[in-house]
Amino acid sequence: MIGVEHCDRCGFDRSQWNDRDAERTIAHAGAFLVEWSADAPPELMAKLDARRIDDLKAISTSPDLIDEVHHLWHGLVSIADVRRAAGDVVPRQHGTVTQLSASGGGVPKTAISSAAVGARGIEGDVQAARAHHGRPWQALSLWSQEVIDGFAAAGHPIAPGNAGENITISGIDWSTLHGGTIIDIGGVRVQLSAPAVPCQKNAQWFIDGEIALMDHDLHPGSSRWYASVLQPGTIATGDTVDVSPI
């Protein structure tokens, strides 16, 4: 894997990475591998645990920081492959894009009718805190319309785009998603990479600043999801969303 520029198997593209993004990503390698194994059936966990140990060993012995990222992504895709081969897949679901959102930096993001999406996300969308956002696996942020509606019904002053998600989706059971899930949105294919950690900037959308309500670890099925872009294209409000058990 040393020096590979692009990997068709895992989607790794060296040109999309710099040392800072790679270093911050590798710091959470173990958490990534655990997240992509989450909720796997007991009969698979021993196999996934052994694979995770091998992946972490390969990462730790790699001579190059960017190559470490490649090892990590290979490991993640391997986990997805093992789960898929065993029939441990997210159920096929169909939903709809209820809002696309972008901004020149910070929250809230504002609604747009359509967008071109590349490897780095929605063209023209800017992340205010680049140190914590904008890595290839954070190209897009997705959230559930039903989750937002539930918060709003409880009295929280939140609406689509407020929390910084780019794509708000209805009709998908958010509690069924996990790392590695592949979703087709309009003309774009994405892969879920990790749940987004709540940001203090979003405290304004919750009564008493209770951002823990959107924390994946505390409230599974309530968080935004980061996604990498597997196939660039365009998305428009009202487009079909397909969760693929592949």
Predicted regions and their residues:
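Short, basic/aromatic beta-hairpin or loop at an interaction surface
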Residues: 156-166, 207-223
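Electropositive, beta-rich accessory/interaction domains or terminal extensions
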Residues: 2-189, 194-201, 234, 244-246
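Well-ordered alpha/beta subsegment
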Residues: 225-246
